[in-house]
């Protein structure tokens, strides 16, 4: 497969040789963003004080760290929640303080759901709530046992039939991740991401503020529908967790982002199993690249992501390759699974890309996560993350480096505003200074 891809790339290069240069003379340069979602973390006692990135075997990311601009980046601006919407907006080169309006409008764009200027999009999770010994209710599982997309679609269709109307619309997504739109709705209420409150009592995290009563009404009304749903009965019979309620959060209006083509004169694509990443791609002007077998979980087609990413560069200038499994393992609080996901990302995605691009001299990489997902907390945190800017045209010689938090800090290189890294990638900077 690698040989045939290389042959195809060489053929594509010959065909494109006569094309006019674009984006300020960088015509033949290819740009690759490699994003291992949430793979940064804190030192863990179970790993002898190492982080999962330190404990994992990552020869390909280490190779990049030894040859690129390597340091730590502040991806999440002060005052923003450490969500994937904020983090990936930064990585794609947009200042969240200017452009961020909420998470769910991005997911709506990915799903092809149009939003009017007064429409509010909400993430609609299918979750499992559990009962404590004292009668309280807690967030048992924000993924409803990683419910399948097919099962979830059946549930969301029934929710839409029974709870939709009067400006409320439901749209099925992937696994536990779905969408609700409130036409001419309200957005100023406070909502809580369910992945932030795993194993906690939900009473203190219900929606509050103007419009919260509508959300509460919908969430409560979903419980009897799901309690008697045939999909849940089948899941329980098979030993799986049921989806016991919908959980609404992450609201916002449609943002206005200038495309990367307009900003830099480049065209590109996005590879991800997650709607929010594709939604950002829609607003950034990046095409969706479909890869068979990608799931957003530990069983995803890692190698396919790398292969399709390399192949896409025959026609495109840039590819953004996102892997969700590292984040999911962090939310599970599973050290071994997170290390495995990191190693799979390194070997099957990063390694495949490095091999596929090895015959070229004119390509650049930005490697980083969007935020840490802390094993001990089972949620996102806003701490800075390790990043690498690598240029095959002008590789650096940093000595032996491991792609991890500790070695990144040792370099003394700090990107205080991570959204500026995209510009540095396009320009091919070999040093990092921030004005």
Language-model segments: residues:
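Feature captures the catalytic ectodomains and active-site-proximal regions of enzymes
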Residues: 10, 16-435
